[in-house]
Curated annotation (Swiss-Prot):
3-phosphoshikimate binds at K23, S24, R28, S170, S171, Q172, S198, D314, N338, K342. Phosphoenolpyruvate binds at K23, G97, R125, Q172, R346, R388, K413. Its EC number is 2.5.1.19. This is 3-phosphoshikimate 1-carboxyvinyltransferase. It comes from the Bacteria. Keywords: Amino-acid biosynthesis, Aromatic amino acid biosynthesis, Cytoplasm, Transferase. It is found in: Cytoplasm. InterPro entries: Enolpyruvate_Tfrase_dom, Enolpyruvate_Tfrase_sf, EPSP_synthase, EPSP_synthase_CS, RNA3'P_cycl/enolpyr_Trfase_a/b. Monomer. Belongs to the EPSP synthase family. SUPFAM superfamilies: EPT/RTPC-like. The active site is at D314.
Amino acid sequence: MQESLTLHPIKLINGTLNLPGSKSVSNRALLLAALSEGKTRLTNLLDSDDVRHMLTALTALGVEYHLSSDRTVCEIIGLGGAFAASQPLELFLGNAGTAMRPLAAALCLTDGDIVLTGEPRMKERPIGHLVDALRQGGAKIDYLEQENYPPLRLHGGFQGGEISVDGSVSSQFLTALLMTAPLAAQDTQISIQGDLVSKPYIDITLHMMKAFGIDVRHENYQRFFVAGRQQYRSPGDYLVEGDASSASYFLAAAAIKGGVVRVTGVGRNSVQGDIRFADVLEKMGAIVRWGEDYIECERGELHAIDMDMNHIPDAAMTIATAALFAQGGTTTLRNIYNWRVKETDRLAAMAIELRKVGAEVEEGNDYIRITPPAKLKAAEIGTYNDHRMAMCFSLVALSDTPVTILDPKCTAKTFPDYFEQLARLSELA
């Protein structure tokens, strides 16, 4: 019997939420700290499945660290260079793309025999473009099951040099190459083929590499230049920003139902592109206020929009369920093909579940159109082992209709106590 959670209609949502640390920033910070010279103290680290997979892998690779009892402060003793794997290793990375992709690249600096594997869904998430790029730099990589997908066997060999990579599927491939390149024997020049998706996630990578002592030059995000034979240096203390994607559910809830919700841990100068989600809510009609360390949102009459969402693919999912509350017709979210290669095929899943609550949905190859019904229907929402599906569809309870979320614990990937926090800020009808 699958676990489920029924959310009863919410009359009002109000209060302040201190955001858990960003998944994207947490796993990048752990890897950079592990490769650095010196000791790094990471604060506001996210405690979630993806981060635990990264920590487990680092332990297997000989990295020493100390984690606080609440798992949000981590002191890491850096290796001062690439990992050394003296004996064959197999690392199980669950469904953590933010661990699989960067480690696949970083471990190609090390001669050895390392297998990277994960859950069945991980074996359906493409990694061929990254493997092709690493091979151009001299890496020796074998596919153990299906061509272009994990599991992978790595034998080192990455030297750098001239590399081209397809940017149209996932920005994590470029992130993985960028973070590895400074430790390569040669300088690396990376040319991007196709349109680079999720560009703001590359900005996170560049910003964090700089914090750890490495500068990267680029020409308008089309060519990147990284000097080889460098060393990452610990910044000493590094604060992990709150997760801007996690903020999206609470900001949207305020926009739909009000009161006023303030999320802290991100603000106007955040390194994460997903803070731009608040601009989309504002465009729909919500009232948004920005501080250095917070974003605040309150209800406005929401209107349908038609927008390119390539810059905020994760947070854009929240707009798909917010669209159920928009006046004036059909909301169209465009340029979101990369939803299809995430934790599940999010475009297909979103279309199926939106129809269950009564919406009219057109699902295109890289877009979705959503026309809300006059009244939402009560439904059981499948979550596809995808944390964002569970959190997005919790917003249905902001109507006068209850909603049942199947497998609510799947939020553990990024936000283990999401439903407790939602309940804390909610006043039931």
